[in-house]
Amino acid sequence: MREIVHLQTGQCGNQVGAAFWQTISSEHGLDESGLCNASSDQQLERMNVYFNEVGNSKYVPRAVLVDLEPGTMDAIRSGPHGALFRPDNFVFGQSSAGNNWAKGHYTEGAELVDQVIDVVRREAESCDYLQGFQITHSLGGGTGAGMGTLLISKIREEFPDRMMATFSVLPSPKVSDTVVEPYNATLSVHQLVEHADETFCIDNEALYDICTRTLKLSSPSYGDLNHLVSTVMSGITASFRFPGQLNSDLRKLAVNMVPFPRLHFFMVGFAPLTSRGAQSFRAMSVPELTQQMFDSRNMMTACNFQNGRFLTCSALFRGKISMKEVDDQMLSIHTKNSGYFVEWIPNNVQTALCSVPPKGLKMSATFVGNSTSVQELFQRVATQFTAMFRRKAFLHWYTGEGMDEMEFTEAESNMNDLMSEYQQYQEASISDGEEQPYAEEAAYEAEE
């Protein structure tokens, strides 16, 4: 029944992944050890998309946990939800990738990858009808970025016709862990463009801004950031996990969201974002939700969509809401801001409704947009990449692991191509497409 196998790689990927499983297991009425005490049929109906039932109402996540060092794994295993995961599905090395993409992709990671693929294969075999994979990782480190992208391409080889969705945390200038992040991120984007079907871009900088501005947290921890990411992941996947009409699996989401195969980098947002203590003091209405959801301050991707245009976007509302009210609101937003949507894709705003609200809220809305302004993210990384690469700074760490400078040049030009493709479609208008055939004919006649 339309299963999804989840992989989490590297420290960031594992922490985000753990938060995601915590969120969705409580939404489906599972306790910390995976025993089911669901109160409604809706919680049970599509449980097997993410969970495998192993007798007497115990459910185990279809999750594969990967890292090149044991630290994060030990933390998850000894954490509150450690007993949820299947012990054989923890695959880890002893060395660490040391924030070096080449180590994750070519040396250390390559030694571990066959072991991981075995576990993935076993998970896939226990599915009735596997729809695809999702992976949580960061693009700035060594394991999540290097080994994460290696896993994606290996899974692509083995399961060429299955969907591949990634939740990728991009490095941000304000919150930098290591100086080589621009290298790691560029090399990763180079891989994601080719091998992933949909990439949800999440940005630490935007998450920090939300925590400090909206949630009024003076010094947000990674726990707070991961809480935000898991909320948005739960919102995106709600249409896979609960009965609904629109975007009910990964492929349908991609069909609605990806007009050109390379342009599959989405920005995500969520509403209502209220600080933990203030939730109970206000009732949300659909107009308020919609307003908040289209507010650039609610985006978890640090680029301003007002600088670009939406090719497509999709909104998932959750809770007891009338479909008509949602449609009216979305229509009015679309009409008021029609300049922000390309006019050559009609009906490019999709809405879905799921009647099960997230824990602790009456209603919520999750936003996924394919906007041309996502090029700002890549631009930021590219500028930093170029500054270092011109001087060949830190390159010896990568060439020492057997990489070639050529690969950096290729990755850089692939990312530049991606940015110019976004730019081209941002500027395209309806009339562009119609003029070209005549222009070609005219040139042809002139030659004769």
Swiss-Prot record:
Q: Tell me the residue numbers annotated for binding GTP.
A: 11, 69, 138, 142-144, 204, 226
Q: Which InterPro entries match?
A: Beta-tubulin_BS, Beta_tubulin, Tub_FtsZ_C, Tubulin, Tubulin/FtsZ-like_C, Tubulin/FtsZ_2-layer-sand-dom, Tubulin/FtsZ_GTPase_sf, Tubulin_C
The residues that the entry says bind Mg(2+) are: 69
Say yes or no: keyword Chloroplast present. no
Where does this protein have compositionally biased stretches of type Acidic residues?
Answer: 432-448
Q: Which cofactor does it need?
A: Mg(2+)
| GO MF entries | GTP binding; GTPase activity; metal ion binding; structural constituent of cytoskeleton
Give the record's keywords alphabetically: Cytoplasm, Cytoskeleton, GTP-binding, Magnesium, Metal-binding, Microtubule, Nucleotide-binding
What are its GO biological-process terms?
microtubule cytoskeleton organization; mitotic cell cycle
Q: Name one Pfam family in it.
A: Tubulin
* Compartments (UniProt record): Cytoplasm, Cytoskeleton
In residue numbers, the region (Disordered) covers 429-448
Q: Name one GO cellular component term.
A: cytoplasm
Q: What does this protein do?
A: Tubulin is the major constituent of microtubules, a cylinder consisting of laterally associated linear protofilaments composed of alpha- and beta-tubulin heterodimers. Microtubules grow by the addition of GTP-tubulin dimers to the microtubule end, where a stabilizing cap forms. Below the cap, tubulin dimers are in GDP-bound state, owing to GTPase activity of alpha-tubulin.
Quaternary structure, per UniProt, is:
Dimer of alpha and beta chains. A typical microtubule is a hollow water-filled tube with an outer diameter of 25 nm and an inner diameter of 15 nM. Alpha-beta heterodimers associate head-to-tail to form protofilaments running lengthwise along the microtubule wall with the beta-tubulin subunit facing the microtubule plus end conferring a structural polarity. Microtubules usually have 13 protofilaments but different protofilament numbers can be found in some organisms and specialized cells.
Family note: Belongs to the tubulin family.
The protein's name: Tubulin beta chain
Its source organism is: Aspergillus fumigatus (strain ATCC MYA-4609 / CBS 101355 / FGSC A1100 / Af293)
